[in-house]
Amino acid sequence: MIIVTGGAGFIGSNIVKALNDKGITDILVVDNLKDGTKFVNLVDLNIADYMDKEDFLIQIMSGEELGDIEAIFHEGACSSTTEWDGKYMMDNNYQYSKELLHYCLEREIPFLYASSAATYGGRTSDFIESREYEKPLNVYGYSKFLFDEYVRQILPEANSQIVGFRYFNVYGPREGHKGSMASVAFHLNTQLNNGESPKLFEGSENFKRDFVYVGDVAAVNLWFLESGKSGIFNLGTGRAESFQAVADATLAYHKKGSIEYIPFPDKLKGRYQAFTQADLTNLRNAGYDKPFKTVAEGVTEYMAWLNRDS
């Protein structure tokens, strides 16, 4: 059995899909379906069982055996960069991850988990998986950074696989439940389909991010499970592309619309990553050599998926 925490969420459900595509269906999805809309991410997928996150955590903390576990993909977390409840964030992202890590270490179960490029904070260069480059801007980034630091202490002595992925700007299918935290491509598509002008912040040609397609993210996760490699790795494309490029690809697909530029909100000033670009040196050195989709390629594929029923 493979366990995917956050399996009804964005990246988790895409990992479930990638496993299904390999013929794997003996999957336990762990999630919190308080937001019932997330079920749509699983409705076309095949899993063996579902468990609520709180029930799962109780079983993990009591040391209860959950059966023959081949691996755990830990994607479950509060991923809102605008959530400032530090206690909630540390319980949800840090303590929960530690409990799960130790459960896996005691049983030598491969543990593959979601970290984040938010660990780098407001850098504009050198996105390198090393302490001197890490300075998160928000409590979400801090919770991810602190767990990475915890893992670094354990890695040298670990007898089983531990691998963390610093996800950069992931976009693609199954993110609709994320609301305001969904990707720019998702929001632009929604605005166009609603007959509205698609909106970008002023200066969006200068805001550049490493936009990585979720299908590529899932592929890297599965490759690492097969390779058995451990460590903390950036997971982006290694290319920074502008929000304008995302908009251009969206408009090109729809063959209509023009961008309306809106003022940059004061509340995001100083707390906004204006530039991200993954350094893929460690990922490539680990042996992952497949190419990553460009924004033009990924957004086009995503638009076809979003508009498949129209």
From Swiss-Prot:
Assigned keywords, A-Z: Carbohydrate metabolism, Isomerase, NADP
Nucleus found in the keyword field: no
Sites where the protein binds NADP(+): 10-11, 31-32, 38, 53, 75-79, 92, 144, 170, 178
Domain of life: Bacteria
Catalytic activity, EC: 5.1.3.20
Cofactor needs: NADP(+)
The reaction(s) this protein catalyses: ADP-D-glycero-beta-D-manno-heptose = ADP-L-glycero-beta-D-manno-heptose
Cofactor: binding comment: Binds 1 NADP(+) per subunit.
Binding annotation for substrate: N169, S180, H187, F201, E202, G203, S204, R209, Y272
UniProt record similarity statement: Belongs to the NAD(P)-dependent epimerase/dehydratase family. HldD subfamily.
Role, per record: Catalyzes the interconversion between ADP-D-glycero-beta-D-manno-heptose and ADP-L-glycero-beta-D-manno-heptose via an epimerization at carbon 6 of the heptose.
Entries under PANTHER family matching the protein: ADP-L-GLYCERO-D-MANNO-HEPTOSE-6-EPIMERASE, NUCLEOSIDE-DIPHOSPHATE-SUGAR EPIMERASE
Protein's UniProt name: ADP-L-glycero-D-manno-heptose-6-epimerase
Naturally occurring in which organism (per UniProt): Salmonella newport (strain SL254)
